Amino acid sequence: MAAPISPSNYSGVLKVAGAPVGQELGRYYLREAEQAYQSGGSIIVIIATDAPLSDRNLRRLARRAFIGVGNTGSSMSNGSGDYALAFATAEAVRRTPDRRSGATIIEDLPNDKISPLFQAVAEATEEAVYNAMLQATSTTGVDDHRLEALPLDRLKEILARHGIGTPTK
């Protein structure tokens, strides 16, 4: 199992299940070349897994989170600070004081068994980003800079127009 969490604050052209939500809302990065619109923002993804992964495979797992971020429409533009961190809770890979006192054998998941975790992290990261966006509220920050929450009613309309989230017969 792998479980990402992500506080999302980044720019891009929002997509939900392939639907061009950002374009249809008229709220997206680079919508008008002459507009003085700041790109950037940041995203941080933290991934916890109970799989026994080596430090090398944890780095590989963390990199796969950005597949999910990209699926939401982020281009990870210049000025964007994008980070992913993965850690394992499996007892087999824990570095306890006893294990640090001498040579040890670490039993970790072999490379040829990790692809399903890569897929899971990409999909779960995409969902974590959507969850963060859908739970966000409008806010006013420094210098009265205001960010509006996604209009959920409009989001539902856009998704329905694209046949997403509608009941099938």
What are these regions (language model features)?
Residues 1-169:
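A structural signal for small-residue-enriched, beta-sheet-centric alpha/beta enzyme cores
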